[in-house]
């Protein structure tokens, strides 16, 4: 009711979508019902923001490349940053040249981007996730004012396929209203019933 705040919008930092989608991506059992709920959930009048990665935690590339955090460079004996990342390294910790590992990681990244960009609500991407940015397994780069914490824009050239995939998903979302309805989907065709 304060006139100074009349145009102010408050956002809630919720990790429900993030945690459920991460667990689904890595193959945890019993996630389908929760995934289906969060894919169609609009969040009521206040709306909802959906993300799988954010400024606190792994980048999308690191989410599929590391099972555990690697925050040694932060000077806190790897005690800082979240311990539970719901990540899976796809068979090798950190960077890999194995074709099967790289192919699986690329597929998992595309799956994650698909979930975020085509779920109901407002999609949010961590800067650099659209082209494979990495923080080398550091999930708490608050003190890394160096290449570890910076977005490496060279990835835009070296990971063009991922960038194009993101653009295609954005095009789909903008073009087809089924990806941004005014009302929450309920799992049945109301018009045809």
Residue ranges and their predicted role:
Residues 1-127, 140-144, 177-184, 191:
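Conserved alpha/beta catalytic core and glycan-binding cleft of carbohydrate-active enzymes
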Residues 39, 89, 151-154, 164, ...:
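Short linear interaction motif-like sites in intrinsically disordered regions of transcription factors
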Residues 116, 130, 169:
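Hydrophobic, well-ordered secondary-structure elements that form the walls
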Residues 126-131, 135-136:
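Short acidic/histidine-rich active-site segments
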Residues 135-167:
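Extended hydrophobic/aromatic segments used for targeting, binding, or gating
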Residues 158-193:
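Catalytic cores of secreted or luminal carbohydrate-active enzymes
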């Amino acid at each position: 009711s304060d006139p100074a705040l009349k145009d102010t919008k408050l956002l809630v930092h919720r990790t429900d979508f993030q945690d459920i989608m991460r667990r689904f991506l890595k193959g945890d059992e019993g996630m389908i019902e929760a995934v289906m709920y969060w894919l169609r959930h609009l969040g009521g009048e206040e709306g909802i923001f959906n993300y799988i990665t954010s400024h606190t935690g792994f980048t999308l590339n690191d989410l599929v490349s590391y099972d555990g955090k690697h925050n040694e460079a932060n000077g806190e004996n790897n005690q800082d940053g979240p311990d539970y990342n719901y990540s899976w390294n796809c068979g090798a910790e950190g960077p890999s040249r194995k074709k099967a590992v790289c192919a699986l990681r690329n597929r998992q990244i595309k799956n994650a981007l698909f979930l975020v960009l085509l779920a109901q609500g407002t999609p949010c991407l961590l800067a650099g996730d659209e082209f494979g940015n990495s923080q080398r397994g550091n999930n708490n780069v608050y003190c890394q004012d160096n290449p570890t914490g910076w977005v490496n824009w060279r990835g835009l050239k070296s990971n063009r396929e991922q960038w194009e995939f993101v653009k295609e998903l954005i095009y789909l979302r903008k073009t087809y209203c089924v990806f941004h309805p005014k009302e929450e989907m309920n799992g049945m065709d109301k018009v045809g019933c």
